[in-house]
Amino acid sequence: MKDMSIPLLAAVSSSTEETVRPIADFHPTLWGNHFLKSAADVETIDAATQEQHAALKQEVRRMITTTANKLAQKLHMIDAVQRLGVAYHFEKEIEDELGKVSHDLDSDDLYVVSLRFRLFRQQGVKISCDVFDKFKDDEGKFKESLINDIRGMLSLYEAAYLAIRGEDILDEAIVFTTTHLKSVISISDHSHANSNLAEQIRHSLQIPLRKAAARLEARYFLDIYSRDDLHDETLLKFAKLDFNILQAAHQKEASIMTRWWNDLGFPKKVPYARDRIIETYIWMLLGVSYEPNLAFGRIFASKVVCMITTIDDTFDAYGTFEELTLFTEAVTRWDIGLIDTLPEYMKFIVKALLDIYREAEEELAKEGRSYGIPYAKQMMQELIILYFTEAKWLYKGYVPTFDEYKSVALRSIGLRTLAVASFVDLGDFIATKDNFECILKNAKSLKATETIGRLMDDIAGYKFEQKRGHNPSAVECYKNQHGVSEEEAVKELLLEVANSWKDINEELLNPTTVPLPMLQRLLYFARSGHFIYDDGHDRYTHSLMMKRQVALLLTEPLAI
């Protein structure tokens, strides 16, 4: 370990007696009051549209349950329903139909075998990866003849990302398919042939389906599916209508969040913090849910993220060590009476924080299910203590080892705080005291999701943070502990991220004491984190990089 020569927390200059604060200079909001104005223009879904939606829904349900007995057709139909984002309407039907083909193992079609494997694993069924042995040659390598089956190769590529640790054949499949699919793209770019399939390949190479946030993937796939010569017009129309109906509801929620943010006065009272209210809402739309019946959890989680962001920026970019000490005491004791000791900007933060949890508790108490709120408060208190630990490191100029860093930083990413806040809306039989206790103590997926979020965040932001004198990141701590280059450190951290995805996959195949909906929520958070931090970018902090996605999900309805 070594000491940094100059502590870079906010400090009081001895010569001027003025507080010097390492403000990060985040760019201003991109959306302002846009959704306050646009919400007034959102038309209420009329009765005729609702009736059309209901009729199409019944027709799609009939199609799912009466699809011809051909395995390929049935699997293709289920896959389309899921990728178009409307599977939440047909969960029982999909479960039943997959059950009917659970023992159908005779196919030698790479596309069918791979698709069946992926759909069953997505459903939580631990189908063996041995089904791919038939596609290897006598030397144990994938048969070269497979490269001519482009659709099959893409299907195998997507299936391989549902691997768990130790499934070497799936690791080999990713290498094999990636190499040859890139060749397909290269040829397509020169010949302009098979443009729709080439576009799917290009998209999948950028973000495999397993890592893709469902709502964004649905919006992308709606365009792809509409250009597929074999698309079903009824399913496509239903999916478009469903997307637009949900989008109208999401626009209103974005308006609610904007009004809450402005009414409390965040932009004026904490101007140093990131003003990302719409990006926060989108993050929760991807990480918590997009379904209409989970609006409370989506909005509550969005408010919690706003507080996490504001508090994180207070610790990183504004507060003095003395102020942070007082702030930590006030929050960990959860006592509004202690705010008199705080500077004005911190009084505002603490009051806003306590009010969010109090209001949620009062709302849930009306339904007799407020027991999740104490766990949510506890996670927030623990997060503040972790932030303060990192502040002490910086104040003392202390550089932790990688192992020491992980013991704090995996938790300080805030995922645990956020996940528990989102669980309060999962329902009486899921959001129970026992289940809260169990997931906090035993869930491998929780640590895996934290690992993905923290390491990808650090890889995306460590150079920016270095410029403003932030604590060392996972990249620097790994580099220092193991004596490797920056590039090698990043490579090793990405391997740890890949293994964490496998841990999530494994726990979803073996749900025991933790309910499946809680584990699925962690998968969604991992996906949303992948979207925010993929390719070494921080789309949340530098939100111009996600402006297009915000527009697709909130401002641009589909033509029907």
From Swiss-Prot:
Primary location group: cytoplasm
GO molecular function: magnesium ion binding; terpene synthase activity
Residues reported to bind Mg(2+) 2: D312, D316
Gene3D superfamilies in UniProt: Farnesyl Diphosphate Synthase, Terpene synthase, N-terminal domain
GO biological process, one term: diterpenoid biosynthetic process
InterPro entries the UniProt entry points to: Isoprenoid_synthase_dom_sf, Terpene_cyclase-like_1_C, Terpene_cyclase_plant_C1, Terpene_synth_N, Terpene_synth_N_sf, Terpene_synthase-like, Terpene_synthase_metal-bd, Terpenoid_cyclase/PrenylTrfase
Keywords tagged on the record: Cytoplasm, Lyase, Magnesium, Manganese, Metal-binding
Pfam families, alphabetized: Terpene_synth, Terpene_synth_C
Coiled coil: none
Family: Belongs to the terpene synthase family.
Protein name per the record: (E)-beta-farnesene synthase
